């Protein structure tokens, strides 16, 4: 009976001591993994930040180009009176004195080239 108790006590002590070692190992292993995970997350975060900055730069560049060229200056369309000294006819049009039907208006009009 004593041998059974001693054996049981010995197995119990071994199990507890080995279990403690495993627990400490597990804790250290988890700390290492979390540190590696943090470094991986930092790397991923930096990579994402770089991509976002590139996209933002492209968008701002497009916005600045768009705002600079977005609206054509007001121009006069075809068949509309214009001033011969300051013609503001749209591109592809020329400010000319009318022929035939517009002679009595005594004004210049925008016509196609």
Swiss-Prot record:
Annotated protein name in UniProt: U11-theraphotoxin-Hhn1q
Positions of disulphide bridges: 75-90, 82-95, 89-110
Transmembrane segments: none
Predominant subcellular localization, coarse grouping: secreted
Domain of life: Eukaryota
Propeptide segment residues: 22-74
Provenance organism: Cyriopagopus hainanus (Chinese bird spider)
Keywords: Disulfide bond, Ion channel impairing toxin, Knottin, Secreted, Signal, Toxin
Biological role stated in the UniProt entry: Probable ion channel inhibitor.
Family to which the UniProt record says this protein belongs: Belongs to the neurotoxin 14 (magi-1) family. 01 (HNTX-16) subfamily.
Subcellular location(s) of the protein: Secreted
Tissue: Expressed by the venom gland.
Region forming the signal peptide: 1-21
InterPro entries xref list: Toxin_22
């Amino acid at each position: 009976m004593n041998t059974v108790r001693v054996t049981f006590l010995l197995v119990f002590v071994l199990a507890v001591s080995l279990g403690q070692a495993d627990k400490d190992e597990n804790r250290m292993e988890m700390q290492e993994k979390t540190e590696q995970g943090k470094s991986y997350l930092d790397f991923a975060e930096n990579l994402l930040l770089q991509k976002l900055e590139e996209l933002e730069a492209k968008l701002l560049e497009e916005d600045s180009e768009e705002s600079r060229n977005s609206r054509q200056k007001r121009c006069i369309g075809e068949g509309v009176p214009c001033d011969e000294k300051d013609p503001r006819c749209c591109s592809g049009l020329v400010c000319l004195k009318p022929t035939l039907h517009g002679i009595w208006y005594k004004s210049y009009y925008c016509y196609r080239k």
